[in-house]
Amino acid sequence: MNQNSSVAEATLQLNSGEKPSPGSIPFISSGQHGNISTSATSSTSTSSGSALAVVKSAVKKPTKDRHTKVDGRGRRIRMPAMCAARVFQLTRELGHKSDGETIEWLLQQAEPAIIASTGTGTIPANFSTLNASLRSGGGSTLFSQASKSSSSPLSFHSTGMSLYEDNNGTNGSSVDPSRKLLNSAANAAVFGFHHQMYPPIMSTERNPNTLVKPYREDYFKEPSSAAEPSESSQKASQFQEQELAQGRGTANVVPQPMWAVAPGTTNGGSAFWMLPMSGSGGREQMQQQPGHQMWAFNPGNYPVGTGRVVTAPMGSMMLGGQQLGLGVAEGNMAAAMRGSRGDGLAMTLDQHQHQLQHQEPNQSQASENGGDDKK
């Protein structure tokens, strides 16, 4: 009892902060010290266990999470679980190395719709801070082209046209043949490659099935499948009617003759030939116009000149679209020949014309004299 009372007095003195005297602190045996230490350790263990339980309960995530985190743009984004599942599936199907590459591919496929809704491409404002993936190679170039084209006011139509032609023009069939025909006809009219002749590319023998989809203003909306065959068939029929009408109009045009110079085989020079041009109905035109004949100027028969025939350019000889040798006077041919370097045939024609002019007044005077004699 005395020992217990002394221990209690010592604990009271420690709690109160008073310094006990050395003689007042009783002696504690080893067994009593062991009991006190075990009780203290048990109390600390129970307190630490309760603290760990509180920490674990706070870190625990909720089980009902409708979103899944997907890596992209250098940070973590949140998207619906269905979208994330589809991205994972596309990554496996397309053989991409990461889900971010799949998202980049999806953005490339959605480029026309993005341009239609926002007016710009998928390139972000802070491109310098973006860790763009260059594995595919086509993503960054496509984005840069879209950004460059978006600076112009016609960026929407120009970019859409390029994408429309690229998506449908893998084998070169996206080019409308009507455009080719119009361009070829314009070039032929400007440069004169087909002079008053029907262009061979615009022949009436055309397969109507080769006419592809015509030019559309809206590239992002496909026409209805039911209305498309009827429209294409109507346009094909109209195009054929226009070709037939143009063919009838050009069939009545009289083809122009072609002048040529044969190579000289002897020292006498070469011959000057006029070759009549015949169109598709060559035999009928030859029957209707018997005046088309092949005739030549032999330089050996003309003593005047050096014996060489002048090669005049086609532009100077085709005077007003008229036919030389059929309805053009000899003076016109002589005028055309004067502009060239030689003078053999031109001088001969001038002399011949001069002789004809002198013969006409002589014949008129002779006829007048004959009439006076009869009177």
UniProtKB/Swiss-Prot annotation:
PROSITE patterns recorded for this chain? TCP
Q: Where is this chain compositionally biased, Basic residues type?
A: 58-67
Tell me the GO BP annotations in alphabetical order. Answer: regulation of DNA-templated transcription
Organism listed in the record? Arabidopsis thaliana
How is this protein named in the record? Answer: Transcription factor TCP22
Which parts of the sequence belong to the TCP domain? Answer: 63-117
What Pfam families does UniProt report for this protein, alphabetically? TCP
UniProt entry tagged with the keyword Magnesium: no
Region of interest: Disordered = 1-76, 220-248, 349-375
